Amino acid sequence: MSDIALTVSVLALVAVVDLWIGNIKVRGVGFGIGGVLFGGIIVGHFVDQAGVTLSGDMLHFIQEFGLILFVYTIGIQVGPGFFASLRVSGLRLNLFAVLIVIMGGLVTAILHKIFAIPLPVVLGIFSGAVTNTPALGAGQQILRDLGTPVDLVDQMGMSYAMAYPFGICGILLTMWLMRLIFRVNVEAEAQKHESSLANGHSLIQTMNIRVENPNLNNMAIQDVPILNSDKIICSRLKRDDTLMVPSPGTIIQAGDLLHLVGQSTDLHNAQLVIGKEVDTSLSTRGTDLRVERVVVTNEKVLGKRIRDLHFKERYDVVISRLNRAGVELVASSDASLQFGDILNLVGRPASIDAVANVVGNAQQKLQQVQMLPVFIGIGLGVLLGSIPLFVPGFPVALKLGLAGGPLIMALILGRIGSIGKLYWFMPPSANLALRELGIVLFLAVVGLKSGGDFVDTLTQGEGLSWIGYGIFITAIPLITVGLLARIFAKMNYLTLCGMLAGSMTDPPALAFANNLHATSGAAALSYATVYPLVMFLRIITPQLLAVIFWGMG
């Protein structure tokens, strides 16, 4: 059997063992994709014992390509919501998550100096303790750039594997500890979270208002400042028994009922100007109007602003809401359409059908993957990661590398959405498949390379001390920030659990947090809010630590 065939066969065996281990769960919690690493270590140990030689160049390529696939698909997935997560609504959560990252780096630096832990080993412990695989890849790459021998770079995978198990368990124990210390009632926390959403500024709501302000009588909607803004959409107007779709030029009269869509504060401000909120239904039922959701799939409208499509003027149809990547937005006239956007349309059936034809509304296209943008994005990401950033006093130039470059490029492209006929939307199933394939390939190779010396290191070497160092790196930041967030910021417990899981970019921890309450989305929301920024910082941190420690000797 050729080296290539043998290498592929061993990798396939590793993947089978890995995924089997990952599916083993105790009380609903398992290693998940982290099981791939341990399967690779097991197979790698026996491969080494048998004296089997695998293709080193092929293993290196598979490892790097797997990492690229993984981080790129993550960036495409979270890109549409990344920049939104940095706004004020998520600022507090991101600050706490960043504090966890910084504290983890400081603890790592202190342990390195006090115990003289070799640089590859301490970076591996750090990556495993925070359960972040791209950090492992970024650390290995910067070490190679610094001229570290290959056998020492491979030690990083071993120390990563030593610290990884408690990295998973540590965050679960922290959640349990917070619940015990503060005697948390999970059901009450879920209700508080729902109440805060209802009273907050993040949800799109509706309000029916009767026009009672005499100053607005016989004025066009576009001449009323509160209605001619990007914060409020007037999607229906009822006059006497007639329900209509208003246009900017529609004249409003005293007694008209307006159906407004926007955030609660903006709706309240509109009510103060216009008149009185009423309970009268403005439902399209029993009228010649209807409400329908359509999806944007036509390349010809991608990147175009809603105002430039003239749906109201041409078809007498209003877009009342826009859903992008699961987030409900006010369909402002300046909003640009992206592939996969879901539009809430109000109008007559024939008119809605006409608008649906314009925007596409081809459900089958949502399941298709444009491969050209995928490889363009990966290529640009690799180029971005290769750009050197020279910092005075540092022995080598900093780079985003193969972990950071594709991630940042994917975040940017995911946010842009489309350029001409190219769009970077990827169906969730396809994204998940590529992401899982990438991480399986990467961790399988890391495990294979580490497996030969893993058992000896654990039983006869410093494996136990590495585990101890990892416990400190995991526990100290999580417990400290958890206490600060709960005591001083009065953070909701479920939100806190999601933030802790997101700060470690740990899906098993998110699964545990979600299971704390069956119906609350608090944990998932906070996890998604901090995940993009934390993932970027987790990739950069080992590179900074490596360069700083290398320069200090």
UniProtKB/Swiss-Prot annotation:
Entry keyword annotation includes Cell membrane: yes
Organism, scientific name: Salmonella choleraesuis (strain SC-B67)
PANTHER family: K(+)_H(+) ANTIPORTER SUBUNIT KHTT, TRANSPORT PROTEIN YIDE-RELATED
Location(s) in or outside the cell: Cell membrane
One Pfam family hit: Asp-Al_Ex
Topological relation to the membrane, as annotated: Multi-pass membrane protein
HAMAP family from the UniProt entry: YidE
InterPro entries: AAE_transporter, RCK_C, RCK_C_sf, Transpt_YidE_put, YidE_YbjL
Record keyword Repeat present: yes
Entries under NCBIfam families matching the protein: PRK03818.1, YidE_YbjL_dupl
Superkingdom of origin organism: Bacteria
Gene3D superfamilies, A to Z: Regulator of K+ conductance, C-terminal domain (3.30.70.1450)
Major site of localization recorded for this protein: membrane
Protein name: Putative transport protein YidE
RCK C-terminal domain sequence ranges: 192-276, 279-361
